[in-house]
Amino acid sequence: MGLRDWLRTVCCCCGCECLEERALPEKEPLVSDNNPYSSFGATLVRDDEKNLWSMPHDVSHTEADDDRTLYNLIVIRNQQAKDSEEWQKLNYDIHTLRQVRREVRNRWKCILEDLGFQKEADSLLSVTKLSTISDSKNTRKAREMLLKLAEETNIFPTSWELSERYLFVVDRLIALDAAEEFFKLARRTYPKKPGVPCLADGQKELHYLPFPSP
């Protein structure tokens, strides 16, 4: 189950008890200490090949689902003979995924700056393994807002699974009472194109990651 499906399941829950259970403990790290991917975390900032965010020595990434997807592609590619057909195909997928991730971040940063967060944009977008939800009471609202952004705007590309890191960004916007304004500006700046379906299956097609200009 991808993040999108998980968000749908929780947001459609009719009771409150399950939400409270999910919110405990109040401050829970995005990736727990027993995460099977944590073994390579210490080297991420030292090696661009394993830097799964956007640029060398960037420590703002975290080992979320999309990070693991990229990491697995890198591992598989490095097992191939360099410059072979399979190596080139995987290398293209890696480059494409990185480009899309950079573009998504740039779109979020652009809207944040337009809202007046010129100095705070980078820190608002910075998500690490130590990041926590500011208030567990905002968790459901953050999930719903992230789904609205994905389904009613073009801020995320089609056929791209939602990233966990943006749940933290939305939570910060809620704490700043800026989430609704962010959504309104995102809908105006990156309107959903007519005929573009909402992401429901969580499938990725790395060779075909359309990211139309606004």
Swiss-Prot record:
The keyword Hydrolase does not apply. Palmitoylated. Palmitoylation is required to maintain the protein at the melanosome membrane. Pfam families: MREG. Disulfide bonds: none annotated. InterPro entries: Melanoregulin (IPR031638). GO terms for biological process: melanocyte differentiation; melanosome localization; melanosome transport; minus-end-directed organelle transport along microtubule; phagosome maturation. A motif (Cholesterol-binding sequence motif) lies at residues 162-172. GO terms for cellular component: apical plasma membrane; cytoplasmic vesicle membrane; late endosome membrane; lysosomal membrane; melanosome; melanosome membrane; organelle membrane; protein-containing complex. Keywords: Cell membrane, Cytoplasmic vesicle, Lipid-binding, Lipoprotein, Lysosome, Membrane, Palmitate, Phosphoprotein, Transport. GO terms for molecular function: phosphatidylinositol binding. It is a peripheral membrane protein; Lipid-anchor. It is found in: Apical cell membrane; Melanosome membrane; Lysosome membrane; Cytoplasmic vesicle membrane. Expressed in photoreceptor cells (at protein level). The modification Phosphoserine is found at residue 213. Identified in a complex with RILP and DCTN1; interacts directly with RILP, but does not interact directly with DCTN1. Interacts with PRPH2. Belongs to the melanoregulin family. Probably functions as a cargo-recognition protein that couples cytoplasmic vesicles to the transport machinery. Plays a role in hair pigmentation, a process that involves shedding of melanosome-containing vesicles from melanocytes, followed by phagocytosis of the melanosome-containing vesicles by keratinocytes. Functions on melanosomes as receptor for RILP and the complex formed by RILP and DCTN1, and thereby contributes to retrograde melanosome transport from the cell periphery to the center. This is Melanoregulin.
